[in-house]
Amino acid sequence: MEKDDLTHFNDEKRAKMVDVTSKSETKRRAIARATIHMNEETLARIHAGKIAKGDVLAVAQVAGIMAAKKTSELIPMCHPIMTTKADISFEDDGNTALTITSEVVTVGKTGVEMEALTAVTIAALTIYDMCKAMDKGMRIEKTYLVEKTGGKSGTFKAEA
């Protein structure tokens, strides 16, 4: 099998979950990021705690952490893993953009890239849901894997 061959298909060319039985357990870590753009007033109201549905960042943080833990229930070929760390942080540009960063860690046989990506995606969707009454034009953009470490493929860092 060549390095780029798809591993999620069986001999009948049907979907399967990859067998990781013989892989070694190693520490694996992934960082992902997403940005949600909104009106200036929306971001100001989030920071002032003046969104009718509640504390937007606290709810989005919990939603992102929950999403990391439930990724295998959402993405069919993801292995259920024991998440040993899931964290969500927020940074704004002081104007109209809020950047969400997740860090997910495990010790296991498969990586946590999908968990980190799912975490930032769900956190961004939660922000959209909580603020859509005042800003339906919000845009979720640039969701990507920033870095991953551990496992056979080693370290990956996105280009700046």
UniProtKB/Swiss-Prot annotation:
Swiss-Prot/TrEMBL catalytic activity: (8S)-3',8-cyclo-7,8-dihydroguanosine 5'-triphosphate = cyclic pyranopterin phosphate + diphosphate
Q: Which UniProt keywords apply?
A: Lyase, Molybdenum cofactor biosynthesis
**SUPFAM superfamilies tied to this protein:** Molybdenum cofactor biosynthesis protein C, MoaC (SSF55040)
According to its UniProt record, in which pathway does this protein act? Cofactor biosynthesis; molybdopterin biosynthesis
Chain positions recorded as substrate binding sites: M77, C78, H79, M114, E115
- Please provide, alphabetically and separated by semicolons, the GO molecular function terms listed in this UniProt record: cyclic pyranopterin monophosphate synthase activity
Q: What InterPro entries does the entry give?
A: MoaC, MoaC_bact/euk, MoaC_sf, MoCo_biosynth_MoaA/MoaC, Mopterin_CF_biosynth-C_dom
Q: What class of enzyme is it?
A: lyase
Q: Name one Pfam family in it.
A: MoaC
Catalytic positions? D129
One BP term from GO: Mo-molybdopterin cofactor biosynthetic process
EC number of the protein: 4.6.1.17
**Thylakoid: is it a keyword of this entry?**
no
Keyword Lyase in annotation: yes
- Chain's role: Catalyzes the conversion of (8S)-3',8-cyclo-7,8-dihydroguanosine 5'-triphosphate to cyclic pyranopterin monophosphate (cPMP).
PANTHER family per record: CYCLIC PYRANOPTERIN MONOPHOSPHATE SYNTHASE (PTHR22960:SF29), MOLYBDOPTERIN COFACTOR SYNTHESIS PROTEIN A (PTHR22960)
Family classification: Belongs to the MoaC family.
Describe its assembly.
Homohexamer; trimer of dimers.
- Protein name as it appears in the record: Cyclic pyranopterin monophosphate synthase
Q: Which gene encodes it?
A: moaC
